[in-house]
Regions:
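Feature responds to low-complexity, polar/acidic, surface-exposed segments characteristic
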Residues: 2-41, 56-110, 120, 124-140
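A short amphipathic alpha-helical interaction element
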Residues: 46-49, 78, 115-118, 146
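Short, intrinsically disordered, charge-balanced linker/junction segments flanking boundaries
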Residues: 141-147
Length: 147
């Protein structure tokens, strides 16, 4: 991933910025209907990522741009983005466990799928074999993911 074109790195940096200021993975609302992003510094990035299907809002029509984001939510965001760039979810995503703390039969199958994609693509390696998907994504961790 380190030898990607500049536009890739710029987009990932923009995605990371939106990620670090947003809780973006819970289903529903479109960017046009987010009731809480008007005037937000990152509103344009949030709208662009929402329009691309990479991030989602909450069922109540909000985006919560200042909420903390978890490592699992970050994995989903990056997985969706990688798909838009032509990366394919591994065929064995639901049979081969990638992280010790995320079994292939976990309730959140979207997380299992995208965890396989980002792990196999070398984007997200976890800590000591664990994804720690419910833990907050720290800025220094995001920096490591982006490099």
């Amino acid at each position: 991933m380190a030898n990607q074109p500049k536009n890739y790195k710029k987009f990932v940096a923009t995605a990371a910025t939106a990620t670090l200021v947003a809780s973006a993975i819970v289903p529903v609302a479109s960017a046009a209907s987010f009731s809480d992003i008007e005037g937000n510094t990152h509103a344009d990035a949030i709208k662009a990522l929402s329009d691309a299907g990479i991030i989602k809002g909450y069922e109540d029509g909000t985006f919560k741009p200042n909420a903390e984001i978890s490592r699992g939510q970050t994995v989903k965001l990056l997985g969706r983005w990688l798909e838009t760039k032509g990366y394919k979810v591994p065929e064995n995503w639901n049979t081969v466990q990638r992280f010790n703390d995320l079994p292939v039969n976990a309730a959140d199958q979207e997380l299992v799928k995208y965890a396989a994609l980002v792990k196999d693509a070398g984007v997200f390696n976890g800590s000591n074999g664990n994804l720690n998907y419910s833990q907050p994504m720290q800025r220094q961790q995001m920096a490591l993911v982006l490099v």
